[in-house]
Amino acid sequence: MKISITAPAKINLSLDALYKREDGYHEVEMVMTTIDLADRLSLERLDEDKIVLDVKAHFIPEDRRNLIYQAALLLKKRFNVKMGVRIIIDKHIPVSAGLAGGSSDAAAALKGLNIIWELGLSIEELAEISSEIGSDIAFCVYGGTALATGRGEKITALPNIPGCWIVLAKPSISVSTPTIYKELQVENVEHPNTKKMIESIKIGDLDGIFASTGNVLESVTLEKNPQVKRIKDRMMAFGAEAALMSGSGPTVFALIKQYSRAKRVYNGLRGFCEEVYMVRPWSESENETIN
């Protein structure tokens, strides 16, 4: 059996860290949505008991360091699976960008393996299992738009956001998520209005969504990396209705209602930034094919 499945990127419409927990993680409130920038995974069931990864990108490990490998190994051990799998990963999501590319790949792998290994697990069971690998993976298992709480693994579904344009720009730098959280001072930052964001999404109010965007991690990343702030400022100068860093960065995204204005923002970032994308909110159409 072979299956092909997409792994869409995510953006944080709002990201709040409330306090640091005893386990070392921060208690978070994040409103996230998937977008139509996506990796593609092709999975083939093997009779031989082995996990084979083939990543069509440089600098990405194909062994136990890869979240996809960890996801496959976890399912094999949990359910005593004696079959193997070959997974080909066609990368389109920028790496180390704050867009959950690795987490989305792992989520797609869990869903694909559930099918080709005939495990019969529910989406809720897959999400629960995923929390053993990483905090963002549970959201990626569900996809769409949702509120993530706890350390990010508790998911409450929300309606999809209204149609709009999203321009992404990633500078040629990398940031360390653990370092950003370590330097975050939750008592000294402006916190986003998560409640207002959720209310705006529920009634389909794009202006309310734009006005409610916020990310407490900007207080650290923008201070350490001025080029990230310059991208955000440039997006607003070219007509973005909202601009925000996704996750711990360094990718910044702009939200725009009209295509013509989005194109202007996109063109204004090309040449200024190495990786620029113009996308839409994710649609579930053509998510997976089975042969």
UniProtKB/Swiss-Prot annotation:
GO terms for molecular function: 4-(cytidine 5'-diphospho)-2-C-methyl-D-erythritol kinase activity; ATP binding. The keyword Oxidoreductase does not apply. Gene3D superfamilies: 3.30.230.10, GHMP kinase, C-terminal domain. One of its GO terms (biological process) is isopentenyl diphosphate biosynthetic process, methylerythritol 4-phosphate pathway. Keywords: ATP-binding, Isoprene biosynthesis, Kinase, Nucleotide-binding, Transferase. It holds the Pfam family GHMP_kinases_N. It catalyses: 4-CDP-2-C-methyl-D-erythritol + ATP = 4-CDP-2-C-methyl-D-erythritol 2-phosphate + ADP + H(+). It comes from the Bacteria. The active site is at K10, D136. Pathway: Isoprenoid biosynthesis; isopentenyl diphosphate biosynthesis via DXP pathway; isopentenyl diphosphate from 1-deoxy-D-xylulose 5-phosphate: step 3/6. HAMAP family: IspE (MF_00061). Belongs to the GHMP kinase family. IspE subfamily. Catalyzes the phosphorylation of the position 2 hydroxy group of 4-diphosphocytidyl-2C-methyl-D-erythritol. This is 4-diphosphocytidyl-2-C-methyl-D-erythritol kinase. The gene is ispE.
